[in-house]
Every structure is written in structure tokens, then in C-alpha cells.
Design a protein with these regions (language model features):
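Structural alpha/beta surface segment adjacent to cysteine/selenocysteine redox centers
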Residues: 1-73, 117
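C-terminal cap of thioredoxin/glutaredoxin-like
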Residues: 70-154
Length: 154
């Protein structure tokens, strides 16, 4: 596999409503920041969910959901403290709001979520090798390596 004969494609999959602004915000940054930001999101995911337990945040998120599309995701991101999280990592508040107001990007993320959901993808991570979806219990590296070798990787 270290020979370069295996290629890896990462596709972000929004399962929950709050995943849409997260996915859009990761795409906001320069390309070279994409994977470092993804790692930051996954590394801090539990902490990022804490605001969801706060009734005031829940109320603000619900209010954001009723806004017009171009205002919805900036307001949701602000309510959930995502804008603040990304600002600390180089995506300014203005840049974040501009990206989140781009309805085409948010719609693309939502459409992909629907398409992947209809294809039976319902969790992250989901690994697909040559069209075959690995069972979730095979998401550890030794099992992935075994599946890659079975698919022809050397």
C-alpha cells in the first residue's frame, strides 16, 4: 500500500443538521488547511457537542432553523459556537459567514447527505473499497489493510 497503488478519497457526510455548517466551514479554508481542520473537528467533536445540551443554545439553533436559507447556517453556526471554533483556527467570522451564506455549498452538502443515506450509508466513518462497503466492525486499520489487500493492493 505504501507503493502508491491505493488512492484515498475523503467525502464528508452530514448525518445531523449541525453537520452541514461544520462541513461547509471545513470547505471554507484554503485546500492545504482542509485535512488539518477535519482532524481538529474530529479531535474536538465531543466538546463541540456540549453546547447542544444548553437550552439557550437549543432555542437559538431552533430559531436559526426558521430563518431564510442565506441566514440559517451562519446563525446556526454562531449558536453552536462553530464560528468561534473555526475563527480560532484561521477562518475569520466574516469568511465563515460568507461561506455559510452560500446556499449552493450548503445545498450540495445536504444533497450528498441524502444521496449517501439512500445508498445505505448511515454512520461515520464508512469505508467503501471498490464499491464494497466494509462493515463498521472492520474500521480499524488491520481490517482495512486486509480488505485493501483482498481488493488487489500490494
Amino acid at each position: 500500500m505504501s507503493s502508491g497503488r491505493v488512492s484515498f478519497e475523503f467525502r464528508s457526510f452530514a448525518i445531523h443538521p449541525q453537520d452541514i455548517p461544520l462541513t461547509v466551514l471545513v470547505r471554507c479554508a484554503p485546500k492545504e488547511s482542509f485535512f488539518p481542520l477535519v482532524e481538529q473537528v474530529y479531535g474536538n467533536f465531543e466538546a463541540m457537542q456540549v453546547p447542544l445540551q444548553d437550552p439557550a443554545v437549543q432555542k437559538a439553533a431552533e430559531a436559526a432553523s426558521s430563518l431564510p436559507p442565506a441566514q440559517r447556517y451562519p446563525a446556526l453556526s454562531d449558536a453552536l459556537k462553530f464560528t468561534e471554533f473555526f475563527a480560532a483556527r484561521g477562518v475569520s467570522v466574516d469568511q465563515a459567514h460568507a461561506c455559510l451564506a452560500n446556499i449552493a455549498t450548503a445545498t450540495d452538502v445536504a444533497n450528498n447527505a441524502k444521496k449517501y443515506g439512500e445508498a445505505g450509508i448511515n454512520q461515520t466513518p464508512t469505508l467503501i473499497i471498490n464499491g464494497f462497503q466494509l462493515p463498521s466492525e472492520q474500521s480499524e486499520w488491520p481490517k482495512i489493510a486486509e480488505a485493501l489487500r483482498a481488493a488487489g493492493a500490494r
